[in-house]
């Protein structure tokens, strides 16, 4: 059991094990070491995750998704966690196609129980090769997902991490992320708020 009683899931939406992989694991390490959270990690790297085809099996049968792939493992992790970190590289000003597919496939969970993710707390980390590389629009799309699923999105507050953690990799992978002191400070700031809000929710839940 963690010191906080909080289980935190980090999801890397990058097909590579570079900047996003590093940033998520750095955030999880910080949450574990600073706050005593229990952590779990999932990466889309080398995973088979099919697109949602809008077949409506999940709507008709209320038995989850008809596809049997890596999402089966992730669904379980998502449901068990109290809080999530969704992280993505920026592709064309938005989250990666791989992460978008993960989010689309969550329709099957909502079809069975539309409150399944209710009151879980979520944050975003988006990594761009440029300093102004589309991180904030990408973070906004993650916030939208959280709101649609009755989750509670958090940022780091004004002056530094408004919508979440925007990180600049300079297209240098993990080394670029490590070098972005401002970006990693934002990661820590948002994790602090994530843990704080998760504790508040747990304390007030009937």
Q: Which role does the model predict for each range below?
A:
Residues 1-113, 159-206:
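N-terminal beta1-alpha1-beta2 submodule of the flavodoxin-like/Rossmannoid cofactor-binding fold
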Residues 97, 112-159:
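Short, glycine-/small-residue-rich phosphate/pyrophosphate-handling segment
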């Amino acid at each position: 059991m963690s010191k906080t009683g909080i289980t935190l899931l980090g999801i890397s939406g990058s097909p590579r094990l570079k900047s996003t992989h590093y940033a998520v694991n750095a955030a999880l390490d910080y949450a574990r070491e600073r706050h005593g959270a229990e952590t779990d990690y999932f990466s889309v790297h080398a995973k088979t995750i099919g697109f949602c085809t809008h077949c409506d099996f999940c709507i008709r049968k209320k038995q989850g998704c008809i596809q049997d792939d890596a999402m089966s493992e992730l669904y379980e992790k998502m449901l068990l966690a109290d809080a999530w970190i969704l992280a993505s590289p920026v592709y064309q000003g938005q989250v990666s196609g791989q992460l978008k597919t993960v989010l689309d496939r969550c329709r099957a969970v909502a079809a069975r129980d539309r409150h399944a993710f209710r009151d879980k707390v979520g944050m975003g980390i988006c990594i761009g090769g440029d300093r102004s590389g589309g991180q904030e629009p990408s973070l906004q799309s993650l916030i939208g997902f959280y709101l649609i699923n009755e989750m509670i999105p958090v940022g780091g507050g004004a002056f530094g991490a408004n919508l979440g953690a925007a990180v600049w990799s300079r297209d240098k992978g993990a080394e670029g992320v490590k070098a972005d002191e401002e970006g990693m400070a934002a990661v820590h700031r948002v994790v602090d708020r994530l843990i704080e809000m998760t504790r508040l929710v747990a304390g007030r839940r009937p």
